Amino acid sequence: MVDTHKLADDVLQLLDNRIEDNYRVCVILVGSPGSGKSTIAEELCQIINEKYHTFLSEHPNVIEVNDRLKPMVNLVDSLKTLQPNEVAEMIENQGLFKDHVEDVNFQPIKYSALTSNNEECTAVVARGGTANAIRIATVDNPVNVNKLAQDSINIAQIVPMDGFHLSRRCLDLFKDPQTAHKRRGSPSTFDSNNFLQLCKILAKTSLCKVSSHHKFYSTSSVFEKLSKTFSQKIPDIFVPGFNHALKDPTPDQYCISKFTRIVILEGLYLLYDQENWKKIYKTLADTGALLVYKIDIDYEATEERVAKRHLQSGLVTTIAEGREKFRSNDLLNGRDIDNHLIKVDNIVHIRND
């Protein structure tokens, strides 16, 4: 079993080490289907946030949000802007770019939009269209910390790769839609274009620095340091999740807020050495604030887990069908990951048998 408390300590130590140079740190957590990566990511996130909530309960009124940020962050200035008529055409096509659904070289583009909460934002879309959109909220109203419940301030946030599954409508437009649906979960059935763009955005925010009027000492805790270095200038970033009942992405399910100092990215292909996936590691590693974990587990153990999950989510009607689906798709994806793992020295391998 994975010691998630030890992982939490390692992540907080990285944040402590880098807090003068990086606004946030990132964690990559990779494993084959059924390896437990989602559960581990959720536990890790919960442990870190609970530790911070305990700190806040013992140190009331410690949080400060200022507007001192270096450099001033412009997250998507290099992206092409869609014109209103182009946005209208995209919406008319059910939020898709019909000629680019399989184009892994399609460059993400941006346009003015609204979040699910009806806030002004910049939407960033790629070959998956609006289903896999990233939405960056407009920075405007200052945060009033006194009106925030302390247990609502989370410094860790998970970002599952699942939200970047191409929608079923998108897969329908593939040259071979039948195979695309059957092999859903393989590398080509994710919007790797926009997930890489998300990593570029996170890297930019990571490299921002916030000055503080407070002098920190060697005895100052990491929670004390980060509580004095939240920035109003860091925008909220909304990313999609995945609804297993609907079998499609759901918009704005996760929010990477200005309080998020640890981003836990979990998924199958984040260390994959092909197409856009191969650029993710370097994009985040170049910030100097990255931890990378690969979960190793025997395929015999994952077969039953995944078969039961397929049955519970309604993808199959019997456990036997679930096992067959695992062998014809999930197992292939797991082996693909192992055969195409990027070659870097700092991947920490952990067992979860």
Curated annotation (Swiss-Prot):
EC number: 2.7.1.-
Molecular function terms from GO: ATP binding; kinase activity
Disulfide bridge positions per record: none
Sequence positions that bind ATP: 31-39
Keyword Nucleotide-binding part of the UniProt annotation: yes
Lineage top rank: taxon: Eukaryota
Keywords, sorted A to Z: ATP-binding, Kinase, Nucleotide-binding, Transferase
Keyword Nucleotide-binding included in the entry's annotation: yes
CDD domains for this protein: AAA (cd00009)
Family affiliation: Belongs to the YFH7 family.
Protein task: ATP-dependent kinase that could be involved in endoplasmic reticulum membrane assembly.
PANTHER family per record: URIDINE KINASE
Identification of the protein by name: ATP-dependent kinase YFH7
